[in-house]
């Protein structure tokens, strides 16, 4: 079936709507054409489409951008103003250094003596010329000496390797190779950046700006002429200076009456500050005095308590401590005593806790088993030792031997139970005398005299009843010391340099060398 002959199934209402829409568009086109021919441009119809989230800007962005532009313009304006002021000052300074003053009165206003500076500069130029002349004369005098000619620098083989001078963006003279010059200039331009035109936001030309500035200066000069003659202050000559002087600077008014009022206000504030400072210091002194009185009361209470307890020395020291710290002069350091060569002998007697009970030190408690095994081992070693390798018998004369030797001495006829205690003490004295005579050649005479005095002074004391009791307990103490691993205190020795002197005075003698 042919498609072209297929009937369209369209309602009559849709055809009417289509004709109406076509007629409306034709009428709008005719109106726009007539308005365009008449020179009237119709405004486009606003679209009611909702903006997307990507096209929507934050609130206040446009205002902040405008504010930044205004601030940038103000900064550029202040920069131009300060630059112009500096250029004017530089020109004025050049004129002054050359001596071009308008009149003599203005010359007296400046603190710098430019006339003297000109004279000094002329003197420096004259001295420079004189030095050059002296150098030339010296060169003429040294013509006889051989001077090697300077070697000329050969030209470069490659023209790109030639050294050239250029000026960078900061006005500095630089030198580089010719082949590197384009890259350096390009980098200099990138570092310099594009500067914004300061006059882009204003419609005033340079001539108009200069005219406004001239009018302002004329106005200021007229006001200065109307004022009576008087002192010149810093605000009078500042002339809208762009420099910021900080928070410590107070800009006084140029009017004299208002200036005096401002100065009076500042003086009043200064006096108030001084009064508050003095009041604060007085309050601090009162607090300090109250604290000192409280401390003195506490100190007196403590002194009273110490005196009640019977500590008079500490109480006096506490009372005099404050006076000594505040009023006493600095005492001289005590002289350091010189070392003497004398030998001081200190006699120390071992005291047991109870008579008949051996004294055990704190660090020796619990060591009985260990020292017992050690003494047993030593006894076995002595039994295994060859008598030929034993030490001489002189080493053990007048001394108690360890476990095996002490038992032999106790079983010997000299210390047999059949003898009395006075006989044992007499035998011990004989042994000590024999040892002293044997070592008389080695012991110094001072030590011999001291040992004789000790033996002579203690001999009658041994006959007393108290020493007899000590002699009766000597065997017990010796046995206890041998068990503890501590050497017996009965045979006493006086150690002096490399020799020893036995003594049976019942004391340990330890020498202290000063």
UniProtKB/Swiss-Prot annotation:
Residues 66-98, 203-227, 266-321 form a coiled coil. It comes from Gallus gallus. The gene is CCDC174. Residues 63-83, 335-354, 376-388, 420-429 have a biased composition (Basic and acidic residues). InterPro entries: CCDC174-like (IPR025066). Signal peptide: none annotated. It is found in: Nucleus. The keyword Coiled coil applies. One of its GO terms (cellular component) is nucleus. Keywords: Coiled coil, Nucleus. The keyword Coiled coil applies. Its main location: nucleus. Residues 42-83, 137-162, 270-291, 306-490 are annotated as: Disordered. Residues 405-418 have a biased composition (Polar residues). Probably involved in neuronal development. This is Coiled-coil domain-containing protein 174. Residues 141-162 have a biased composition (Acidic residues).
